[in-house]
Amino acid sequence: MAPFLKKPKVIISTDLNSESFYPGEPVNTRIFISSQDKTKVRAGTVNLICTEVYWKLVSDGKHTRNQKTKGDLYRIEEEFLTPTELFPGTEISVQKSIILPADSPPTISGRVVNLSWQLDVKLDIPKTRDIHEKRAIIVRPITMATPVMDDGEFARSNRITKSNDEGDLALILDSDHGIAGKTLSGRFEVMAKQDTSVDSVRVELEMNESAGTKSSKTVVDMVQLENEITFFPGAQRQWLFSLNIPDSAPPSFFMGNSSVEWRVKGILDKRRWKDFSVEYPIRL
């Protein structure tokens, strides 16, 4: 049996230029190594790792259940130290830069979807456990500018309709892209084809998350437009509205086992009967 080799007394510390980054930006770090032992190092590497937490169905032959698991969506590794030998009192300082890929997924901490990034500095030590220094970082989403319409008009291309025997519904938005911390404005239109009584007319901002076999639906904001109204054949009504997008709203996302989807819904709530609604998918 091979003798037990104790972990060498080597300390790693890092100094990051920032704790949050955008895709395509460099992650610059100063790496400090201090040794109190004589130690051989096979290699020193810097890793940028994006970890996804999701659920999957597992079965023991009798029962099936959801099991939480995790996996790497991204792992970028670069070497900063070639094979070397450390001695007591050895101190090393290395500046290293790694570029985040342009398509890097953002950090997301939702009800279901969870994506996290970390910087992992590793020393590969023969015949014993590697030495790590890990730092959490935040990768921010790249937001898209919201087009501004002249004279308060809504773009015709940002219109979606739905029809049935009762009537026609239409949602018109000022943009199909939302920005966290801002409002999304639009107009909800109803044209009735027959007598229709509803308990309420409202619009909702809805977020749908999915991580493997687990999902969540959240109404993030809601505006009540009308209560207890009856539409007669040929009647037309329209309402302006604004929905608030929270500062902490996660961006639209689809990669690996995870997704975040956003939509605006215009709803005729008929309570005892199936609601009549129209949905407009948006990107955040």
Go through the PLM ranges and name each one.
Residues 1-284:
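C-terminal beta-sandwich interaction modules and adjacent acidic
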